[in-house]
Amino acid sequence: MKKVFFMALVPLLLISVFSGCGSETQAREFLGTQGDFMAMENDEITIAVDKVSDGVAHFFYTDLPGGDPVYFFIVKSPDGNLRAAANGCQVCGGSLQGFHQEGEFMVCNTCGNQYPLDKIATEKGGCNPAPINPDLEVKDGNISITLDQLKGIKQFFN
């Protein structure tokens, strides 16, 4: 009886061990607000200023060359500046929870820390949204975010 049990158990163990040993890793799912997909053209994303000038955080995502996704938001702060940052906390980014807006604050969905909109994209390090560019380029009524800038936030979503 023990021999039959052992012979039935060995194939099951081998299947379970080797089924998870592929060379590809499964992408982790982003659990925060993904927002609108933005296609990259000529190594940049352009977003109409009038689409993001209402004081409400607008969430976006794109896929970098190679397929790595990045998630970000743009918000016009009370001081009148347009600000872009990763939708991932520099400390809690690995949780893939992102941020949400409460009035004039962005709130980390993981730790609950609040960040004034006027400070978004101005500070590196610590527990705040990772900055993309504190001086967003606006040309012909559009915001431009470059591939290199988006590569700078990639690590928060792997």
Language model feature labels by segment:
Residues 26-99, 133-158:
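N-terminal pre-ligand scaffold of iron-sulfur
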Residues 103-112, 122-133:
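Short cysteine/histidine-rich metal-coordination sites, predominantly Zn2+-binding motifs
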Residues 22-24:
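Bacterial signal peptide processing site
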Residues 96-101, 118-120:
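Short Cys/His-rich "knuckle" micro-motifs
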Residues 15, 83-86, 102-105:
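Processing junctions and N-termini across compartments
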Residues 1-4:
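Positively charged n-region of N-terminal signal peptides that target proteins for export
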Residues 17-20:
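C-terminal motif of bacterial Sec signal peptides marking the signal peptidase cleavage site
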Residues 11-12:
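Repetitive helical segments and hydrophobic/amphipathic motifs
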